[in-house]
């Protein structure tokens, strides 16, 4: 089943059997009834703000209430200060589902504390990551046409609010200490941003690099990359950075992937990063501070042993985040809600404590 936003082209691949037009409420009811009739075992719903139609995505409630099949909802975002409408949608969705999955202990705690959700309704399952080998970055760089110059990497859909400017502003100080260091910004511009203002934001970053005299040390890879190539870029990175200014961010797929690749990570202390990078698994720096970022980068780029120590800790921690482990946990939850096994009385820390 796919949610179809307005103005998006088709068609979908063969595995998509049903399509819901995002802003057409009758589609939600029709597809729910179709799933009831075709004997679907379990319906797995991914909830993210902005995906579902209606006010704050409340059409998803009509969909879930029409379902007569066991339902598991995965919550990708839990807002620390929701509006009354956003809170109503999320709490109602959790109450309507047979099980709800969050990807961090911080998210589970927030739902319990601020939303009044019964913790027994929540399962904590890590954000999944590919099972990448732990390799030397310099052994991988030639596959991307790179020299062995040190690489600081960010990836994801490009858009404001991710702190890329702060990293670029840190680069003059970094290059003074490590002249051959390079910052790579990997990823296409977010399609919604592209639709509304084109490449204005990307150009502003490029202009910032030029103004600071580091244009030759900042590389923009302006395209979407598939999973295999993304894995290669992660393996090639010496340092990974998530400089996000929003300290309430409850999950980050990019940070999860960097953990899975065993990277030395520098990050602002948003909720998810604080959880994953605790106990010496990374470096946390204050948000919006080019100087703090530069200091962390220089330390790591000057000391291979420190990089490898941080990366090794991140890699070990991420082993329960790899997709086979995450898939096994979801199968357990699906079986439980389908009535095939009894609900567990206790869940092991390894499988329920978030690592991604």
Predicted regions and their residues:
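Acidic donor-binding loop of glycosyltransferase active sites
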Residues: 98, 217-223, 232-249, 263
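Short hydrophobic beta-strand element within catalytic cores of glycosyltransferases
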Residues: 259-260, 264-267
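A short helix/loop element that forms part of the nucleotide-sugar donor recognition site in Leloir-type
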Residues: 134-146, 151, 347
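A short, well-ordered alpha-helix in the C-terminal region of glycosyltransferases
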Residues: 292, 299, 306-320, 332
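Carbohydrate-associated surface elements
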Residues: 106, 128, 189
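Conserved acidic donor-binding segment of nucleotide-sugar-dependent glycosyltransferases
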Residues: 279, 283-290, 299-305
């Amino acid at each position: 089943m796919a949610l179809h936003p307005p103005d998006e082209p088709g068609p979908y691949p063969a595995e998509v059997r049903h399509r819901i037009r995002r802003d057409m409420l009758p589609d939600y009811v029709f597809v729910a009834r179709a799933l009831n009739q075709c004997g679907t075992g379990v319906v797995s719903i991914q909830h993210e703000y902005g995906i579902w139609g209606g006010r704050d995505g409340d059409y998803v409630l009509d969909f879930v209430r029409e379902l007569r099949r066991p339902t598991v909802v995965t919550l990708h975002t839990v807002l620390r200060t929701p509006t009354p409408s956003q809170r109503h949608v999320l709490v109602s969705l959790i109450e309507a589902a047979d099980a709800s999955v969050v990807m961090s202990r911080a998210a589970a705690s927030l739902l319990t504390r601020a939303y009044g959700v019964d913790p027994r309704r929540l399962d904590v399952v890590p954000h999944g990551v590919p099972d990448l080998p732990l390799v030397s970055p310099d052994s991988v760089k030639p596959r991307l046409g790179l020299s062995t110059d040190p690489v600081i990497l960010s990836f994801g859909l490009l858009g404001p609010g991710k702190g890329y400017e702060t990293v670029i502003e840190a680069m003059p100080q970094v290059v003074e200490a490590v002249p051959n260091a390079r910052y790579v910004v990997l990823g296409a511009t977010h399609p919604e941003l592209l639709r509304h203002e084109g490449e204005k934001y990307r150009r502003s970053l490029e202009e910032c690099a030029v103004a600071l005299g580091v244009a030759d040390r900042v590389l923009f890879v302006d395209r979407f990359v598939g999973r295999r190539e993304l894995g290669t870029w992660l393996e090639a990175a010496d340092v990974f950075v998530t400089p996000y200014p929003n300290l309430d961010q409850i999950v980050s797929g990019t940070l999860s992937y960097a953990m899975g690749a065993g990277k030395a990570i520098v990050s602002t202390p948003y909720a998810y990063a604080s959880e994953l990078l605790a106990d010496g698994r990374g470096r946390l720096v204050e948000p919006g501070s080019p100087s703090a970022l530069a200091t962390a980068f220089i330390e790591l780029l000057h000391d291979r042993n420190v990089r490898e120590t941080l990366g090794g800790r991140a890699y070990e921690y991420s082993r329960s985040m790899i997709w086979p482990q995450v898939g096994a946990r979801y199968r357990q939850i699906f079986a439980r809600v389908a009535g095939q096994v009894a609900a567990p009385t206790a869940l092991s820390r390894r499988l329920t404590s978030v690592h991604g």
